[in-house]
Structures are given as C-alpha cells and as structure tokens.
Amino acid sequence: MKVYGTARGPLARIADPIAARARARRHAALFTLTGATPATRILDVGCGTLGLRGLAPDLDVTGTDLVERPSYPGPFVLADATERLPFEDSAFDLAYSSSVVEHVPPERRAAFAAEVRRVARSWYVQTPARSFPIEPHALLPFAHWLPPGPRRRYWRLGAQGHWEDIALLGRREVEALFGPARSERVGPLTKSWVCVRPVGAGEA
C-alpha cells in the first residue's frame, strides 16, 4: 500500500516504507484500543483508494470520500462528511478516520466531528500532531510552523503532493472535537493524536 501514493520524488520514496510500517502498527493497535472484531460494522471516513481495507481486507468496512474511488475494494459512498452523510444515526458500530481531519477546513471541523459521532456508536480518529517537527505530508522540517507565504515556497522542496491547504491540529483542538486524545510517540515527541471511543462504550 502506497502511503505517499499521491506524492512524488525522492522524499516520498524514502518515507513510504517507514510510513507504511507505522500505519501497520496503528492498524494492529486499532483492535486493541477499540475492541473491534471482524463482525464490527465500520465506516472509513475519508477512505482514499484503500484506507482501512488496504491492511484489513476482511473487515466489514464501508468507505466514504469526497471524490469517486473506482478501485475501492468494497462498498463505497461518495459524500462530504462535513455535511449530512446518507446514513441513519448509529448506522455503524465504529467510525474510522486516519489522517483526514487536518484536510478539513477549520471552520468545517466541528461539522465533520458531529457527523462522525452521529453515524457511529464509537470511533477511532487519528491525525498528525502539529507539535511534531516534521510535516508529514510535505516531509519537510518545520514546514507547518511557517506563515502561509514562506510555507508555500518551502513546500516546493518537499514531496510534491498538493498539501498546501493542510492545517495540523494541536491536542486541545483534537480533544474539543473527539474527546480525550492518546499520544503516538517517536521517542519523546508526539507524532500523532488518536481519539478512541471503544465499541460498546456507554452501553448497558
């Protein structure tokens, strides 16, 4: 699975196997953290071309994304998760979203979070941490800490994806949307935030 499939250049080629291993570890932890099983009905919000199915193809996963994904290997719904998704309340046992919310315009993030919480009884949401010094899309040090003008110019030196409108989140922002956040670390540094409401939480 190409983690940096939409980027090009030597930085992407170097980073791809590293990121793929990190994502594999995250997916393995998904089951421990959420209590999900093969019978769990999962909505992958912002699924991309493979998403969760790329590493766990036997799960009961429905994908949804802003653009058509004709190669997506399972049920797929074209929809904008900042608007009302075409699902009933609590239609899924678990909503899964990995490295998506940072792509959502800040003014639409509350709506995005509300839809994730509406359509599923539990959730697993991961997003890169703004405090980590390497911007994970451009693969450049400090790129996300620069003002917009210098950032756009600097971005051209990195992985050549269309990442300019990404805005990474801090812990308070993430927790305001999805509740308590866990820290995924690289050494002493927080690389990602993960918010989890386990399957079955709050049920009698």
Protein language model regions, located:
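Short glycine/proline- and acidic residue-enriched helix-loop micro-motifs
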Residues: 12-16, 154-164
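Surface-exposed alpha-helical segments enriched in charged/polar residues
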Residues: 28-32, 114, 172, 176
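Class I SAM-dependent methyltransferase Rossmann-like catalytic core
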Residues: 1-35
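Conserved SAM-binding loop
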Residues: 31-132, 197
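Short alpha-helix
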Residues: 160-180
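Conserved class I S-adenosyl-L-methionine
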Residues: 122-149
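Core SAM-dependent methyltransferase catalytic element
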Residues: 182-204
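Soluble or luminal CAZymes and related metallo-dependent hydrolases
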Residues: 18-28, 108, 166-173
